[in-house]
Amino acid sequence: MEDGTDARAFLAKAAATFTVLSLLPVALSGSAPSHASAALRTISSSDFGAVPIGDVPWPTSLFASFTYEHGVAFGTYAQFAYNATTGALRSLIGLEGRAPVLFLESIDIEGFPPARSAAARGPIFEAAGYLVTITAHDDPTALLEIRSDMARLVTVELPAWSTNISLVSVPGSWRASSVSFVVQGEEARLFLGAGWFNVTGTTVLAHLASPDLLVFKSVPAASKNKAEWRAVLDAISAGHVVSELDLVAIADGRWMQNPGRYRIDVATWPLAVRAGQASIQVDTLRPGGAVVLLAFDPETMPAADPTRLIVRANGNPVNRSNDTLSLFYAPDSLTRDASYSLLPLPGTVIALYLPSLAAVSVEVVSVPQPAPNPAFDPGSEAAVVAALAIVSVAAARMLRRREE
């Protein structure tokens, strides 16, 4: 009898164990409710009423805010003097590095009777003359734009200690000419859209066409990604990067912005910006494609794991490319479709190639990745409890039989 009892107990234990083993895969497998990827939420028409603010309450890694007093524009990243009578700029200084860098001694614009008072609002300083506008940016590159609607001469004096001054001209194309130079070990460039440069020593004569755009931009002195910044300057010089838009979302559906233009006919502006989502418009009257840079602070557009980016152009998904060099240097050879690449620069910086820049609506969304499936969902947990109950009952019966 003892042998028979032990055999029955063993069978009961084996059956219980088999039941547990058969139920555990249910508990541990993919039977938990699936977590579908979050859908791309449409930006409603009510969002388009958001009004960007002008003053930047705190410096960001993308831009800060100018203060303009007594003819001097003071910023976190850039500083210069402005003559309201002649429209001349003096001593453009980059403040990004450990020590200030004097990039430009002076800029004198021919035929510049000031049309209205100069003003600084947020990261933008703007002064207008006769058919010409100066726009300076308080950003790490000390970006400066001079847009002219008539042919004119602009004289730029570089510091006497400038080195590696180099002129590149490609007549008949936009970007027609560029001048690169180094000051105190830091690199900077001048870009001219349709006209040409003459360089004598440290004097640069920019012959602007009608209309034309003269741009200054430097490699941020404190950056750990100088090679990537040089690639950006190369792409601007080649005419492949045509605009930049820096965005930081704040409370109540508002945002701060810093738009930069590298081609005179391309406009890029935000329609709505909030944490994790932005709607942007790109437009031009010229055919052909190019790259636009869209930069966000990490809080506005998280891109690090476990989040991912969704980019759409006119409602169509845009594929991500890891071939940034082709995107910058030969975008047309890479693909005829829109594509984007993430640049290793501060914040979330997207290089977006568009095969056409005419009337393009761009959406960028940061989507949290689904959390890992829990080891036990409610249904699986109930199955495990039932299995353990069976084991307990079988064990109790086995013990009673042994006692008998």
PLM regions: where:
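Short, hydrophobic/aromatic-enriched beta-strand segments in well-ordered soluble domains
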Residues: 280-286, 294, 362-368
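Long, low-hydrophobicity ectodomains and other hydrophilic envelope-associated domains
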Residues: 39-289, 317, 324-330
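Short, surface-exposed loop motifs enriched in S/T, G, D/E and P with embedded aromatic residues
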Residues: 318-323, 338-340
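Surface-exposed beta-strand/loop patches in extracellular or lumenal glycoproteins
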Residues: 156, 283-309
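C-terminal beta-strand-rich structural cap/linker in extracellular carbohydrate-active enzymes
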Residues: 328-370
